[in-house]
């Protein structure tokens, strides 16, 4: 197995509170990276998840930024990107999906498919990302497994194939039958872990000895139905994102995660070709190429440092080698590239396709930037969507203006939110997906940059990026709508409509102007 074939790079994504970060912790435990998984069950236990490294994440018990964890597991090199589950941070998750080769979607067995899960599955479908679905919390009362599978197919518009099956659920949960490895994983409630792994023929009497007569009979009937209704395991269809593999379990118990983990590493794809604007880039190509999908400021609060996360797409990244920054047409060398365990970094000498490399950033990178050995190529990313909430940001401490401006600039570079400058009054407007992002921005400005800000309401409905082949009409529109015009950070014209009616009237009155609801067109 060569270096490319042994790479596994994936994201763990889900609706809030489905147990995604808990599952990540268990995978780290199985990979030997941590001795005890951070208890994220409730706030009384003062441990925090290893992948939740920001202070605000530790305080609130939620993930607010994608974290990267890399480790060896058997013959494989694994890169996990643990994403924010809260819907306010959907854009960070969308960007993360540009950098992975496959994804685990975590679904709560009681709640089933939720709005956030549907949205994320849409992005996976757009990129044909192979998907494994982990139905979590089978040790609690929830929906019937067959009902959940029907819901997954209908709501996520993807065929499913179960590779494990629960033996009862809720208080009667006894464990799982691993269909993929034809093995029983049994669970004793008072020990909260797998007590026994048994290879057993489900048609033999030995099954009754382990789970009892009633559960043995039900398991046989369920598995017969699974084989009759759902497609057989097909690696090609899974790799094309046409069929999702489904596992059922309970992430906070050591069972389920490990069965999923061993199977997932075996069937997950190695790095795949990536479409650039100019051509298809293949991982086995000899020359290095990669793109920046995330920027994080203050990953170490003791040092005001920025780290750009680079996904290696082809060739081999080598420390201190000269690489072309395509957007700026400059040659750069990196003396201290790093790999990650949440906020803990270690310097590396080389990296291969599928790896995530941390590059020191002093303001030269933007999300979507490409690095190559000289070729002028541009990787396609995901666009920014029109924000759903808008507020003016004002300086609450005039003595800290410099710190505030630097903080806003770095947080916007990270993609925490979007910044617009109103052309009419010059005021800065922050656009976000939800209210929690405003709180995170205010918290981070105060704690990381020693700057104070306050929010003022502004009544806006939608941000529209505008363009037109008719220069005269474009200028006429900008003149008439001057008080609603803004510039984004790239200097592009943005129309800030304050209502759906105003937007529709503008589209009707100016037929030659194109109104875009994403920043890439």
What role is predicted for each listed range?
Residues 1-521:
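Structural and coupling elements of P-loop NTPases
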